[in-house]
């Protein structure tokens, strides 16, 4: 995914000519990989921070397949590894393209919410395509009106979230609520935890 990461970050920088702090969650990047990323972004006002994640924190418990790698769960450790000066931030999957300025989006008022995200209204995450665990959890009385969001682009209220959530909390939800049988792994966990505190963009 290194190539995709470089393309995504280049599109971000091209359309947002300001200083950007980039935090990259990883467990296997080599010095050569890191240098390639830095070379790719050399002409932009970017500072790259590498946040190492221990793969063993997730391996052996969380569902993976050809589509869902273990790295998909790394965002569940963000609140544990980010420096204390980070108040809000975007989370981006690497398979996106930024095609315009994000200034207005970045400065949106959270109105007390943990997240700002976009509704996921296609694929397997809509009621008519729910699998058994989705039907059980998102079809429950508490969540049946929940508008499921896509976790590939998130504006995160880090200042608020770090006082309530951490890796252990999210993993507890994976175990106690989902029995590790998520259908859209980390995205299901985030939708369950933040279903009352996500503003749809």
Regions found by a protein language model. Give the residues of each.
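Glycosyltransferase catalytic domains, chiefly GT-A lineage
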Residues: 1-200
């Amino acid at each position: 995914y290194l190539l995709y990461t470089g393309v995504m970050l280049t599109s971000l920088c091209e359309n947002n000519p300001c200083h950007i702090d980039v935090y990259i969650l990883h467990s296997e990047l080599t010095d050569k990989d890191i240098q390639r990323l830095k070379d790719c972004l050399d002409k932009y006002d970017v500072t790259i921070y590498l946040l190492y994640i221990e793969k063993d924190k997730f391996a052996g418990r969380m569902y993976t397949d050809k589509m869902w790698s273990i790295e998909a769960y790394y965002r569940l450790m963000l609140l544990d590894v980010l420096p204390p000066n980070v108040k809000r931030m975007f989370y981006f999957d690497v398979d996106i393209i930024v095609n315009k300025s994000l200034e207005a989006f970045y400065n949106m008022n959270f109105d007390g919410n943990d997240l700002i995200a976009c509704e996921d209204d296609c694929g397997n995450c809509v009621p008519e395509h729910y699998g058994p665990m989705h039907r059980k959890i998102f079809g429950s009385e508490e969540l049946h009106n929940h508008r499921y969001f896509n976790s590939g682009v998130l504006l995160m209220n880090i200042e608020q979230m770090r006082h309530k959530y951490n890796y252990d909390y999210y993993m507890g939800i994976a175990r106690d609520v989902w029995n590790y049988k998520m259908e859209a792994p980390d995205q299901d966990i985030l939708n369950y935890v933040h279903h009352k505190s996500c503003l749809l963009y």
